[in-house]
């Protein structure tokens, strides 16, 4: 038996007046996802335990079969694992976003999706403002900073405060002044940086501030195969997902042209997933684009991202599995909702569908938040999804 998790990040949403009281999933043309719902069994999953922040880190850890209340230590250490960054016993990893702040307002959590090359050039120049720490450039606006302090500071994700004053959301608590000092000392350097001068001259958003958040020590997790007896692989453009794969003992597959945006290499991801199933039992295929569109507040882009996920990932993946001649099961879902209305994540349960060999079919005939609520699985905890997928 081969298993595939098809995950559209942030696809779930709330009913919108602009869409006639429907959600983007209900409006989007998605024949392949609807087909999985028809030939499979649906339900709703609480991927974010009560009291935890609805980040992609918590939600995906849960979907992978780990209880976040037991194993979660922070987002940044997972991304550090993906980047093979060593963390000492007393070291703490922080996510360091390049952001755009205008008149004290968080204008863009990604600095206009600055390129990785530009980000690396800026990161190199920031080493002087992080005494006793280290900075590692990642993909686009994402970087990792390693410090030996501030483990218990309260930090806010920048995508949660789009359009809001940053002064209300600066780090708080023990040693938070150290983080604020680093962020403030970087600002004059960033304002004068050649990369930002070029970006402004081209009408692009500058990376005029850094934002530290998501901190934690290195996680300690049992390997996936030790729990479930299966070998796994993960395919994603996002370091967070790769880091989860590293911590789970999965094979991490890099696909050229995988961008984490709507123009990603969909065909390359599907091809890599089908090839990987020749040597592993389960592939976790993650697409970031719907979430990025939702954070930007662009409902049409989110609908388009959902449709591309359906057309270029879900359809070809099912076709490839059917041609393989092997028994298979698929789990289809988002990790969390990212409602356009609030432009950040929510804790609402997400729709899911499991289809394939030996799955008992229910009466649901469409894949969306409302239809899945009538599914045969009912409401379950997110960390039980993998067990359901294996059990059928």
From Swiss-Prot:
Q: Tell me which domain of life the UniProt entry assigns to the organism this sequence originates from.
A: Archaea
| EC number per UniProt | 5.4.2.12
Give the SUPFAM superfamilies listed for this entry: Alkaline phosphatase-like
Q: Which GO terms describe its molecular function?
A: metal ion binding; phosphoglycerate mutase activity
Q: Which reaction does it catalyse?
A: (2R)-2-phosphoglycerate = (2R)-3-phosphoglycerate
One Pfam family hit: PhosphMutase
Metabolic or biological pathway: Carbohydrate degradation; glycolysis; pyruvate from D-glyceraldehyde 3-phosphate: step 3/5
What is the main EC category here?
isomerase
One biological process term in Gene Ontology: glycolytic process
What UniProt keywords apply to this chain's record, in alphabetical order?
Answer: Glycolysis, Isomerase
Family membership, please give it: Belongs to the BPG-independent phosphoglycerate mutase family. A-PGAM subfamily.
User: Which NCBIfam families is this protein grouped with?
Assistant: apgM (TIGR00306), hyp_Hser_kinase (TIGR02535), PRK04200.1 (NF003242)
What does this protein's UniProt record list under function?
Answer: Catalyzes the interconversion of 2-phosphoglycerate and 3-phosphoglycerate.
Identification of the protein by name: 2,3-bisphosphoglycerate-independent phosphoglycerate mutase
